[in-house]
Amino acid sequence: MEKIIEIQDIVKNYQIGSVIVRALRSVSVDIRKNEYVAIMGPSGSGKSTLMNLLGCLDTPTSGTYILNGTDVSKMEDDYLAEIRNKEIGFVFQTFNLLPRYTALENVMLPLIYAGVGKVERERMAIEALEKVGLSDRMDHKPNELSGGQRQRVAIARALVNKPSIILADEPTGNLDSKTSIDIMGLLNDIHSNGNTVILVTHEEDIAKYAARIIRLFDGEISQDVLNKDFSYN
């Protein structure tokens, strides 16, 4: 399968006062199209930094990041924003929904940024909400939805632009165990439909849903293994 992510010798340093924090130390990893990967690690391991780089929310201090054939390592913010909107669908722990907007309006937002016309973006947003089982909640605002329903809206928003990658950061962190299982089942379905899914988590039970598990420790990859319990649907 063709590579969608190629990271080579990535270093990320932060300067805090007079101290240099080495968040990532020469990290190299490839991810192929339609892979389902979990990135794990304790607090301070560098997993959040790696997620920010993978999501084009930040750029490395040094090293190379090729995303779907494009070198994004040294891109300026405006270009990174275009790449993000085109290539990556984000699912966050805190949902990041706008409280005054309905579910449908929240899902349409990436399409507005992409310049999609009103009729077409409404059609695409309705289709995305139907895929996550929320066809009867489109006109509800976030405070009228359960936590699981809010996360489904967030997943619909992530899918609506038909991105190359779904990047899920602790997607079940604010959910109870039953709702977490439902949401992970939905991510499994998304992967089965051909999407590349990258899951950032500290929970072993959640990481087991992925086909491959990458563990970070002190800014380095300490383990990169296939999940023997993973089964393709």
Model regions and ranges:
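ABC family nucleotide-binding domain
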Residues: 2-216
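Conserved beta-strand-loop-alpha-helix hinge in the C-terminal portion
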Residues: 220-233
